[in-house]
Swiss-Prot record:
Its EC number is 3.4.24.-. The keyword Protease applies. One of its GO terms (biological process) is proteolysis. InterPro entries: Metalloenz_LuxS/M16, MPP/UQCRC_Complex, Pept_M16_N, Pept_M16_Zn_BS, Peptidase_M16_C. It comes from Escherichia coli (strain K12). It comes from the Bacteria. Its cofactor is Zn(2+). Keywords: Hydrolase, Metal-binding, Metalloprotease, Protease, Zinc. Belongs to the peptidase M16 family. This is Probable zinc protease PqqL. One of its GO terms (cellular component) is cytosol. Zn(2+) binds at H80, H84, E160. Binds 1 zinc ion per subunit. GO terms for molecular function: metalloendopeptidase activity; metallopeptidase activity; peptidase activity; zinc ion binding.
Length: 931
């Protein structure tokens, strides 16, 4: 009886403790009800998630729950090598037959078919239409053979060694060197430290087919696999495909995936990364701590707290930079990154102005110490919570339109980490309820927990010897930390949010003309001269896309301004509009479900706004204000201007950028290709930048608004006339630009400044079309280029094992009336002449041969699939209309593409190709070689 009473008292005490304010029973999280999971008799797990966007498309992913972490010391790189070999022969599809089979279905390697190897997993991905049942069956048969019947023929293995070596070589850039210098600090005491997926090239050079097969048989077993199906497919059909093709795999057991717990490195470390190609100088503080796996409500809250701390830091830092309180740095960020299966890192970084490392260190120390002393305010936290809840509510409303690839990737992550897959609705409701327990006090406790963590290191990044000499010593950093810990700092005052966007629009504007261009495609001309193209998509998206296309771009400006126009546009776009600051605009945009972006090119500027069909007005308000009431933040401009000057000063230290600039100047005889001098950049004020940006949209008569979405025309017309028709002509209109003047002489550029053991080769051939290239001709050239790209891949990447990737790209300049072909690849330095000669021989042979019926059929399938997706996607359809307008001066040209596709013949394609691509007017060749 006494024991029973003691147990009862203990249970009552435990329950009372768990129910205290701020404490939470670890309740399980609910799985998305749409997700179907199960396991076959042989141990293979599956996940099926029906998702109708885009229509008739499905993603099929095979996830092997093993990556480079499971490699033995003599296998470093084998997991990645095995992944490559899946595309080099299976029992039924030997050699390149796997890739050829995919291509015969109209699928493109890279876009529709891909694979990757990470530390924890190896994943094979195929995306294809669900309407082609025979192809679905064949793809599933390939997945079955990837799972159990790869061949690892010696000839294929030997050929792939060079491909992997070139992949390794191609990635040895400044980013790679920085990563290598950081790894011993960031990944200390983790298995990840010496298990990079790319592996060791000694292993790649010597591993035998038998060793590859042994690794494959050890890990590629059903109980170590998950098959993921996401898309517009009936769940019963998906399950039948899985069972029919994967249930017959032998029920062999894979080796058990081992776990290596990360040990804390509990002492402060100091790192300096000195690389001339670093774009900025800066200082950062990294913390390492256990990863939060979100499995229950308590971990859901904890993960949100860490995430909110990062967002609060970033928000405050940006506010202080934009307000002018932090003029000693040019930017900064905080982020959280996964560094091992069980560990993460939170870091806080600021970028120095010029090479002032002391100022940067002071700024970061002050920010951290201010939070130490005062934490974050209730107003800041409420703002972050409100903004996040708005994003989550928008995700609920827009869940039917989730990106298919991102959705599949999230499911794969859930499978890998064995965590619940939450629906958007559950995520929103949980956040609304559980975030109430996240308070200023709980965040302060979390912050102090982080700051007391001894597993940390300071990192300074410098790009020149002056900055390196100014880098702080460990003793100086420790002294500065102590100084700021004892310094009394003022609390940060949150500026609040203005969420009112006042638009003074003229409701009297009229439509002066209307024309039907095609079915569901209408052209309007407004009384202010602006043109509007209205289109409806074939899908059911509740999205409205508005794109303002100006026929003014950076080529409309003189040489002494041209290279600053894109920078000015970036500064204006980041400064808010009208009465809304940049931060207030982000909150306003979230609450009204709108997004905005802009892009300046040579002859055009695009301003794109996305809104919702059930509330389109904010989208029109935003684009009106961006054109008529744009503004610029002086401090944002100063930061961007400083960064541009520093980039110019250090251009000689970045060979790849210097090489690209030299090639650009070589191809044109035009001062507008030249870089500006430091004093020219410095003299361009914020007011100059704002004036230049406003000139891009200075005349409504030079703007075409492309509007795509399923909204009633009468409703749209009222918004169009009010918000677009009220845009007035500027007092300082800008003339349309002129194409760059082409260089008339052939040229060759060789730069021996590369820091990596790799050659970068670029060859531009220019062809004079004399007359504008129409859509049928462009389609013929594209079909040819697809076949040429395949030839280059087979001959250079695979047979010659000479390059990791080979790029073949055709572009048409409608204003200059010329066609350019770019051939680009990276390779072993001593082979660049050999491989360039081979590439040109391949092109000559392909020109003589033309394309075949089979190749044309593959191209037609590929394009038809793109057209099907495009016409159901609001965003893609809007982009297609814009491209049609820019390339052919006809917003309806794209409507002929499907019919033209059917009319294409081998004879017509080959005739067009020989007419336009047989005789280049100029050839410009460039090679970037190691020092």
């Amino acid at each position: 009886m006494e024991i029973i009473m003691r147990n009862l008292c203990f249970l009552l005490t435990l329950v009372a403790t768990l129910l205290l304010p701020g404490r939470l029973i670890a309740a399980a999280l609910p799985q998305d009800e749409k997700l179907i999971t199960g396991q076959l008799d042989n141990g293979l797990r599956y996940m099926i998630y029906p998702h109708a966007h885009p229509k008739d498309q499905v993603n099929l992913w095979l996830q092997i729950h093993t990556g480079s972490l499971q490699e033995e010391d003599n296998e470093l790189g084998v997991a990645h090598f095995v992944e490559h070999m899946m595309f080099n022969g299976t029992k039924t599809w030997p050699g390149n037959k796997v890739i050829e089979t995919f291509e015969s279905m109209g699928l493109r390697f890279g876009r529709d078919v891909n694979a990757y190897t990470s530390y924890d997993e190896t994943v094979y991905q195929v995306s294809l239409p669900t309407t082609q049942k025979q192809n679905l069956q064949q793809v599933m048969a390939i997945f079955s053979e990837w799972s159990n019947a790869a061949t690892f023929e010696k000839l294929e293995v030997d050929a792939e060694r060079g491909v992997i070596t070139e992949e390794w070589r191609a990635h040895q850039d400044a980013k790679w060197r920085t990563s290598q210098a950081r790894r011993p600090f960031l990944l200390a005491n983790t298995r990840n430290l010496d298990r990079e997926p790319i592996g060791l090239m000694d292993t790649v050079a010597t591993v035998t087919p038998a060793q590859l097969r042994q690794f494959y048989q050890r890990w590629y077993q059903p109980n170590n696999m998950t098959f993921i199906v996401v898309g517009d497919i009936d769940s019963k059909e998906a399950l039948a495909l899985i069972k029919d093709n994967l249930s017959k795999l032998p029920a062999n057991k894979a080796a058990e995936n081992r776990v290596w717990p990360t040990k804390a490195e509990n002492h402060l470390r100091f790192n300096i990364i000195n690389d001339k190609e670093n774009r900025v100088n800066g200082i950062a503080l990294y913390y390492r701590l256990p990863m939060v796996q979100v499995n229950d409500e308590q971990s859901f809250i904890e993960q949100a707290e860490w995430s909110m701390l990062v967002q609060l830091f970033n928000q405050r830092l940006q506010e202080r930079i934009q307000s002018g309180e932090l003029k000693t740095i040019s930017g900064g960020t905080a982020r959280s990154v996964k560094i091992a299966p069980d560990y993460q890192s939170l870091f806080f970084r600021v970028n120095a102005r010029d090479d002032n490392m002391q100022d940067a260190a002071n700024a970061l120390m002050a920010e951290l110490a201010t939070i130490d002393q005062h934490g974050f305010s209730a107003e800041e936290l409420d703002d972050v919570k409100s903004t996040r809840l708005t994003w989550l509510k928008n995700a609920v409303d827009q869940q039917a339109e989730r990106d298919l690839r991102m959705l599949t990737s999230r499911l794969a992550s859930s499978s890998l980490n064995n965590t619940p897959f939450l629906s958007p609705e559950e995520t929103y409701q949980l956040s609304k309820r559980l975030w109430q327990q996240i308070t200023v006090q709980s965040l302060a406790e979390k912050w102090q927990q982080l700051r007391k963590n001894q597993d940390a290191f300071w990192e300074q990044m410098v790009n020149n010897e002056v900055a390196a000499k100014k880098a702080l010593s460990p003793a100086a950093i420790l002294a500065l930390e102590k100084e700021y810990a004892n310094k009394k700092l003022a609390a940060y005052v949150f500026p609040g949010r203005n969420l009112s966007l006042t638009v003074d629009a003229d409701p009297q504007a009229e439509i002066s003309s209307k024309e039907t261009l095609a079915e569901n495609l209408t052209s309007l001309t407004l009384s202010n001269g602006a043109r509007v193209i209205l289109a409806k998509s074939a899908g059911e998206e509740q999205k409205l896309q508005i794109i303002a296309v100006s026929n003014k771009g950076d080529l409309s400006f003189p040489a002494q301004q041209k290279s600053l126009i894109a920078l000015a546009n970036k500064a204006v776009s980041g400064s808010g509009v009208g009465e809304l600051s940049s931060s207030s605009l982000k909150r306003w945009s979230a609450e009204n479900s709108v997004t905005m972006s802009s892009k300046v090119s040579g002859m055009n500027t695009l301003l794109s706004v996305s809104a919702r069909t059930n509330n389109p007005e904010p989208g029109f308000q935003l684009i009106n204000q961006r054109i008529t009431h744009s503004t610029i933040n002086d401090n944002i401009w100063a930061s961007l201007q400083n960064a541009q000057i520093q980039a110019l000063k250090t251009l000689d230290q970045r060979p790849a950028e210097k090489f690209a600039q030299q090639m650009y100047e070589t191809r044109y005889a035009d001062d507008r290709t030249k870089l500006l001098q430091e004093n020219q950049i410095a003299q361009f004020t914020a007011a100059d930048a704002l004036a230049a940006d406003r000139q891009l949209f200075s005349s409504p008569a030079d703007i075409t608004f492309v509007i795509v979405g399923n909204v009633a025309e009468d409703k749209l017309v009222a918004l169009i006339t009010r918000y677009l028709g009220s845009i007035k002509h500027s007092d300082s209109p800008l003339a349309a630009g002129k194409p760059l003047t082409r260089a008339t002489d052939n040229a060759s550029v060789t730069v021996k400044e590369q820091n990596e053991p790799v050659a970068q080769v670029s060859q531009w051939k220019r062809y004079d079309s004399r007359t504008p290239v129409n859509l049928p001709t462009r389609m013929a050239l594209d079909a040819f280029n697809v076949a040429l790209a395949k030839d280059l891949r087979v001959n250079i990447r695979e047979q010659a094992s000479g390059a990791y990737s080979v790029s073949s790209r055709l572009s048409v300049d409608p204003q200059a009336k010329d066609i350019s072909h770019l051939l680009a690849f990276t390779c072993q330095p001593e082979r660049h002449d050999e491989l360039l000669t081979l590439a040109n021989e391949v092109m000559v042979k392909r020109l003589a041969k033309g394309i075949s019926e089979q190749e044309l059929n593959e191209y037609q399938q590929n394009v038809q699939r793109s057209l099907d997706i495009q016409q159901r996607s609001v965003q893609q359809l809007a982009n297609t209309i814009v491209n049609s307008l820019i390339q052919y001066d006809d917003p309806a040209a794209w409507t002929e593409q499907e019919q033209l596709l059917k009319q294409m013949t081998v004879e017509n394609v080959n005739t067009a190709v020989k007419q336009y691509l047989s005789h280049p007017v100029n050839t410009y060749t460039g090679v970037l070689l190691p020092k």
